[in-house]
Amino acid sequence: MLKYRSDKDSLGPVKIPADAYYGPFTGRAIKQYNVTGSPSHRNLIKSFVMIKRSAAVANMKTKAINRKQGTAIVKACDKILAGKFVDQFLVDMINSGAGTAFNMNSNEVITNVALRVLGKKQGQYEFLHPNDHVNMSQSSNDTYPVSYTHLTLPTSDLV
């Protein structure tokens, strides 16, 4: 029998599979943005996670987040870049206009993997938060288009 946890954000609680690494925003988005039935491509996930990793490093350097939080985020990103947890990026490839749903799916997965790195359980956002820490200094209006630009660079004749 599938077990669930109750994850909550500013919009309220959402029933999430207990072993899931995504959170409440993603739980809602899976239902709201079921356009194609296909999640985002793994190369987009990789590109996006690289941006999140870089932001965590920059936020540690400026002391916007503490080293413990930042290091956990970096380690979580490294695990995802190594191919782990990619199955947790479930938001449909066609989602909200500026990629907000994909951005939040990414923030929640990175946060929950980082929480496990810290020895915590998924959803214990009082220790590390998807918006306050993983998304710090970022906007999906910037990160989403940059990730697509990043995807084109390795195969571009201009590089």
Q: What would you call each of these model-derived segments?
A:
Residues 149-155:
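Conserved small/polar residues in nucleotide/adenosyl-binding loops
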Residues 38-54, 118-135:
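Short, conserved aromatic-histidine micro-motifs
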Residues 157-159:
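Acidic, Ala/Val/Gly-enriched low-complexity intrinsically disordered segments
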Residues 130-140, 145-146:
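Mobile "lid/hinge" segments at catalytic clefts and subdomain interfaces of large enzymes
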Residues 1-93, 105-109:
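Generic N-terminal targeting/processing segments that precede catalytic cores or assembly contacts
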Residues 103-115, 119:
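A generic, well-ordered mixed alpha/beta core segment in the N-terminal half of proteins
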Residues 93, 117-119, 141-143:
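Cytosolic, long alpha-helical scaffolding segments
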